[in-house]
Amino acid sequence: MVDSVGFAEAWRAQFPDSEPPRMELRSVGDIEQELERCKASIRRLEQEVNQERFRMIYLQTLLAKEKKSYDRQRWGFRRAAQPPDGAAEPRASAPRLPPAPADGADPAPVEESEARPDGEGSPSKGRPATARRPAAAAPADRDDRGPPTSVAALRSNFEKIRKGPAQPGSADAEKPFYVNVEFHHERGLVKVNDKEVSDRISSLGSQAMQMERKKSQQSAGQGLGEAPRPHYRGRSSESSCGLDGDYEDAELNPRFLKDNLINANGGNRPPWPPLEYQPYQSIYVGGMMVEGEGKSPLLRSQSTSEQEKRLTWPRRSYSPRSFEDSGGGYTPDCSSNENLTSSEEDFSSGQSSRVSPSPTTYRMFRDKSRSPSQNSQQSFDSSSPPTPQCQKRHRQCQVVVSEATIVGVRKTGQIWPSDGDSTFQGEADSSFGTPPGYGCAADQAEEQRRHQDGLPYIDDSPSSSPHLSSKGRGSPASGALEPTKASELDLEKGLEMRKWVLSGILASEETYLSHLEALLLPMKPLKAAATTSQPVLTSQQIETIFFKVPELYEIHKEFYDGLFPRVQQWSHQQRVGDLFQKLASQLGVYRAFVDNYGVAMETAEKCCQANAQFAEISENLRARSNKDVKDSTTKNSLETLLYKPVDRVTRSTLVLHDLLKHTPSSHPDHSLLQDALRISQNFLSSINEEITPRRQSMTVKKGEHRQLLKDSFMVELVEGARKLRHIFLFTDLLLCTKLKKQSGGKTQQYDCKWYIPLTDLSFQMVDELEALPNIPLVPDEELDALKIKISQIKSDIQREKRANKGSKVMERLRKKLSEQESLLLLMSPSMAFRVHSRNGKSYTFLISSDYERAEWRESIREQQKKCFKSFSLTSVELQMLTNSCVKLQTVHHIPLTINKEDDESPGLYGFLHAIVHSATGFKQSSNLYCTLEVDSFGYFVNKAKTRVYRDTTEPNWNEEFEIELEGSQTLRILCYEKCYNKMKMAKEDGESADKLMGKGQVQLDPQTLQDRDWQRTVIDMNGIEVKLSVKFTSREFSLKRMPSRKQTGVFGVKIAVVTKRERSKVPYIVRQCVEEIERRGMEEVGIYRVSGVATDIQALKAAFDVNNKDVSVMMSEMDVNAIAGTLKLYFRELPEPLFTDEFYPNFAEGIALSDPVAKESCMLNLLLSLPEANLLTFLFLLDHLKRVAEKETVNKMSLHNLATVFGPTLLRPSEKESKLPANPSQPITMTDSWSLEVMSQVQVLLYFLQLEAIPAPDSKRQSILFSTEV
């Protein structure tokens, strides 16, 4: 049994009123189990405490509001009258008294005594009460990084004021109630929304703060014992477990040694500054923010009654101390925030679930106060290593809402831009879909770290974006200038842009230098300690970890010192090319750093494991974030900072590209910058291969890596609703995420929906499918209506491009196109792909391609062979993994045509003729068939299926299919074994019971297929080879109705000629085919849609052309799909469509009428105006198609499906009516006008199919129609 000496005695000494718990600790396993039970208990109790604290805060606030006993000025209300001087004294002098709401004491949740009634038991109770924070901030800001006197600490605890029930329609209800202010303990108010206040206000503030200190001294009296200590940045001064963590013993407290590392060798620690004032006392911070014309936001008071209605209560978050102290602790679930908000979109999840207003709240104000240097800061320093160790320490958010706080790296002296300056407005946020120069590669982990550590969030620089607006600043009439003046103005703008690009580079350099400084800061004391008897690291380890960092710092310091004065003394002829050329010539130092990077990281990890003191130091390196604020620093890990140079060098060419873009070729810098770019590109090409694998992995544990294998957008079926998801397959788990809605300027963010370790994942079998819900299918009519809208919008876009109209119209159309394509992508898939977790949960995806489903299943099964152990992720680990997806993803856009680049091939439009010849390589006799898929509208669709070739290892199908292409680029072929005994077959995912034997694909290259000759190819499928021939017919030729050269046949001969020759009202071929299909094809699945064997169709065509009397015998022996194909071919090859070229435009216009009565009258009159042979043949065929549709439950052919098949066949005009170009890969103009035409033809036929009855114009026609001859 394990000896637990001293536990009972220590327990009784600490808790004299309770007996020590009994613990049976017989082995290490017992200790571990007891520890887990203890942790679970802590998590449960902590959650209960937090919930009760949250409820207490709400009730206190509600009580304060109802009794109107709160400190109105502190809550953002204008003080109506100055209270008596003594009003503040009781509040300061009795902070430890228990709450007494009954007698009117202030119950607002800003009093330490109410929020922490157990404060007496803290070992740090010797500290004065005035040094503590208000309780309203305590639950949410336990990890406050700012000084304890920051008014923003109170402000950050309150959400933006929402519309109250008393004024639902208030216009002001959506505006943020608090502004971003900064206070100094001596000077009072120093900044409002990051703008320094005037000297007069500052002097008044200084006087006010002196008065406050005097009040505080009088009221505190002898309550101030010893001088208080300030809070550590990033730490709470009060521990949730009641322990004081600020011991000055260097051996017992590694954090103390780290924070005082430079003075560790005998230097005296500077004295703590006295804290003799009461925080948050008599300070007005309220008011509405109003946009000014290029000025800082103003403070506007509101009426007391209105403000009282809008008083809100604070949100809360969980204390971070539980994460650190309990080894896992309670963590908020990443899929459902614990912040109790009304919208899951208001907060990031998990680690980033900070108590802050919605990002959109401050968006409008942030954009107004943005300077070029601020906008450009995110250039080189934006990325981070895949798993920064600083993220492993789970911290609470900063009290100042970082979304609303834009702190400049460099003082510029002006606010950019103003209301009247629209140069960058709208552009900075509209270019986020593409990499904007050197400013858009920030990964999500880095952005969250900035929020947490105090480094301000800064949008991508408009000055560095390649998508900058060309509008003149303040010159709305610039479009009316003469061409010469306009070109001069453009040149002037380009040179002006050059300055802003350089300003962004300068800001980026400053941030990068601060990171290198943070790396060098611990290096000196570590080297000094290495010579002592108790070194933290050896000299060799220090040299390995910090290899080449001093040299890099010197190089960039010299570059910055040279660039800064030139930008400050700017002129359009200012030269900077020599500086960039010299910087590029020194990239060899980066080569040495990159080569050593892996060794440095490995050494640092080993040192962290071996030395807790160094581990603490390595996770708390301070980098200066704002040179204008003396103590403004951010906390970074050693891993983060060591990755900065690696990330920096991989982006070096982006800066030069942007600079060259705005440097005229006549400028002296142009050639120098080109030379620098050439050097940088050559250098990068040599190291990219080494860096890419590192960026594609994410650290899981020490020495282990989680690799991304595959990712894709899919549709998930959630409680009957379709949801678009992004699925990531890692080496050990399957992760399902949701792409969060992006407000303007925000980078991509993902929410985790669920994950399954691969060891726990399985595919469901047939006996488990009985309880699965049916897949809701979207009617084909709706899908076709969406396609019509998409084609129409694409045509409108092309028209706008040709007209060169304003970008607003184009953006609106592109947004509408994206919405419609996304909806089509969401609604079209119908093939189930189900995954099952060992815990009993199942998830269903809908896929349009069996090829893609098979790929996912193969990838998962292959990886499962390498996974042997189940695991679970904490919500923080899960959040880190989700954040990494932004950088690791390989599929960056939803597969929409709107996301295609302009130079990307639009695909083929026309008809692909494919002959599936044969297959070899099967090991045993099987019943085999093939299916063909092509891509259309961004997803793959099954287009054709061969007949089943029975009991063979070498099937010879030799079947020809005609497949319509709509922007298609790939042809896929899948080979199956037909399984007739379904009971013996493991039926997975609700798919057909047939077994997939192999799959392959071939690219449809317009250059190869444009000569319209047969192209023979062999597709390899892991040992199985399928022989295939393809031929492409472009729209130009497929639209032609070629008349037959001999008028004795029936194909290609006018219908009137055929009926006259046969002395019938309906052609013999039509009657024969319809009769045979109605005899044995009415229950054939996909009749008229499934292609028949091309050789059979050609044989029937020849027989009808020569009037073979045995044709009826031939038809009885042929596949019914070949007979259906023959009938379609006859109508397709008519020299003039059944609806005639003359009436076709009228039918197209009639179907577009909105009034149903007018439409019916128009369409019937047009129909009855057709030539007699055409009308009677159409009515005969129409009656047959309606009978086919009556068997829809069996043959799956609805009226809409039949209209899709026959519409273009019966209505497509002849060549002379077609004005479409010949290029098969012609962009959207031709393809979409054709698509619209096809959709219109389908709608015309569908209209007649849906009409209950079509009256004949006279009795003569009616008698003819129903004559026995027909």
Swiss-Prot record:
Enzyme nomenclature, EC number: 2.7.11.1
Domain DH: 497-690
Annotated SMART domains: C2, PH, RhoGAP, RhoGEF
Residue ranges the record marks as coiled coil: 28-55
EC class name: transferase
Annotated positions of the Phosphoserine modification: S216, S237, S358, S379, S384, S461, S465, S475, S487, S1263
Domain (Rho-GAP): residue spans on this chain: 1053-1247
Phosphotyrosine: modified positions: Y247, Y553, Y643
Posttranslational mods: Autophosphorylated. Phosphorylated by FES/FPS on tyrosine residues, leading to down-regulation of the BCR kinase activity. Phosphorylation by HCK is important for interaction with GRB2.
Subunit relationships: Homotetramer. Interacts with PDZK1. May interact with CCPG1. Interacts with HCK, FES/FPS, ABL1, PIK3R1 and GRB2. Interacts with SH2D5. Interacts with DLG4.
Function per UniProt: Protein with a unique structure having two opposing regulatory activities toward small GTP-binding proteins. The C-terminus is a GTPase-activating protein (GAP) domain which stimulates GTP hydrolysis by RAC1, RAC2 and CDC42. Accelerates the intrinsic rate of GTP hydrolysis of RAC1 or CDC42, leading to down-regulation of the active GTP-bound form. The central Dbl homology (DH) domain functions as guanine nucleotide exchange factor (GEF) that modulates the GTPases CDC42, RHOA and RAC1. Promotes the conversion of CDC42, RHOA and RAC1 from the GDP-bound to the GTP-bound form.
Domain notes per entry: The region involved in binding to ABL1 SH2-domain is rich in serine residues and needs to be Ser/Thr phosphorylated prior to SH2 binding. This region is essential for the activation of the ABL1 tyrosine kinase and transforming potential of the chimeric BCR-ABL oncogene. The DH domain is involved in interaction with CCPG1.
Protein name: Breakpoint cluster region protein
Organism annotation: Rattus norvegicus
Designated gene of the protein: Bcr
